[in-house]
C-alpha cells in the first residue's frame, strides 16, 4: 500500500547513500522526518558540469517484500518514482527495473504513473483528477483503509453517534462477511484482478476515480472475461500467471461457481483476538488460523478429515506435503514479487493440460527430479486419467529441467524458486540442483538471476556464496562459473546418487551436450509479467 514517507513507513537506507543509474547519480539523505533525493546528471544544454535537482520523498509503496519511493515533479500533485527499490529482506537497493520480470533494457517509468494507475489500489478512494498541467490527485486515505472494504462510513458514524443501536439494527455500513460469497469476493476483486473498462469509463476514472463501492456488483463496473491472449499475464488456457489476479482465478474455480467459496473462506482482514501468531506472520498472507494446512478445504470436503480417506485420495502420507490439498490443487504457478505464488484457480493436475499451456505441473514442482512420463503414469494408475502423448525428452528428462532450461523467462523464474522450496528439496534432494541454478545465474533476465541466487544459497555448500545479480555481465558469468565449480568439486558419490532424468551420468558428470541442446530450444522471446 502507499503511505506518507515518514520515519515509521520508510524501510530503505537513506543514510547518505549514493546510487548510480548510468551517468545519473542519486544521493539519498534523511533528516528528522524528511527524506531527500538529489539527482545529478550531465548538463542537458551540453555545457560542462552537472545539473542537480533535490526533491523530497513524499510517498512510499510496499512494506512486506520491497519498497518503492515517489517524489513530486512540481506539476500539481504529480509524482515520479525513484528508479531504485529497496529489497527488505536483503536490505539492499536495486534498480527498480531489476525487481520486475521484464526484458533487459525496459526501464521506462513515466511521471504520473502513480497518479493515473497505482492510486487505484494502493489508496482508499483515490481520484487521479488529471488536468492539462498535471494531476491534482486526492485520496480519502493513503493505504487500504476501512472504507476500501466497508464502503463510505459517514452514515455509519452518524448512526452510531445518534442513538443506542441494537445488534440486529442496520449499521449503515457494508460487512463483507454478511454478503453473498460472490459480492464479498468482488470487494477483494476490485484490486486483486485483471480487468478492462471502456475508454469512456477510463476518462471518467481519471477525473472522478472509480464509482464502484463495496457491496455493488463489480461485474457492472469492470469486465473480467476476455481473451486469454493478453500479453503474458495468462497461461494459454486463461489461467492467471501473475500476482494480483487472485479474483480472476477464484471466479473460474468450481468451488466458487458450484459452491460458496469466497476470499473469506481462507483469509481474514483483521487478526483474531485468539490468534497467537505474531502480527507480522499473520499480515504476510492474512490467512485465518482455521485455513492453515487442510482445514480450509475440509470446511466443505469434510470426508478428508478422515486420514484413511485422505491418504486413499492423495497416495501420500497424511502429514506430508503431498497430502496438503493446496500443493496439488493450488500450486505455485503464478509469479510476483520476485517469487512464485499460489494459483487461486483451483484445478486438477493433468499432464496433457500442462503440456498444452506450458504451466508447470503440480506433481513435478515437488518431484523436481522426475519426468512428465513418471507423473503421467502415476496419475493414470491412481486416478485413471488418460495418458498424454509425450516427446522423447518428456519421457526421459526431469520436467523441472525442461522448464528451467528451455522454458520462457516466467517458467525459468518459477523453477528457480521451486529449486529453493524446502518441500521440493526434501522430496527431490539437492545434490543435483546446483548446476542448474548456476546456469540461471547467467540468465538475461535480472529477476531470474536474483531468484536463482537466493535459492542457491539455500543449498548445502552454497550458504556463503557471494554473487551480485545486477553486476556487469562479466562478473555474473564469473559467478556462474564459481557456482558450477563448487558442485564439481563435491564428492562424486553424492553426485552419482541421482538418476539419469536430471542429466547426470554414471560418472557423476553433467550431460552438457544435452543441456546445450535444450538451451538452443529455449523460448527466449521478450516477456514481461506485469504485476
Spell out what each predicted region is.
Residues 516-531:
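Short, low-complexity, Pro/Ser/Thr/Gly-rich segments in the mature regions of secreted, periplasmic
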Residues 98-101, 111-117, 123:
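A gly/proline- and charged-residue-enriched helix-loop-helix capping module
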Residues 248, 434, 518-519:
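Generic non-transmembrane alpha-helix signal with a bias for helix starts/N-cap capping motifs
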Residues 413-510, 529-531:
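Extended alpha-helical scaffolding segments
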Residues 23, 32-33, 119, 499, ...:
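Intrinsic-disorder/low-complexity loop/linker signature
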Residues 1-73, 81-83, 88-106, 125-427, ...:
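Primarily the internal scaffold of c-type cytochrome electron-transfer domains
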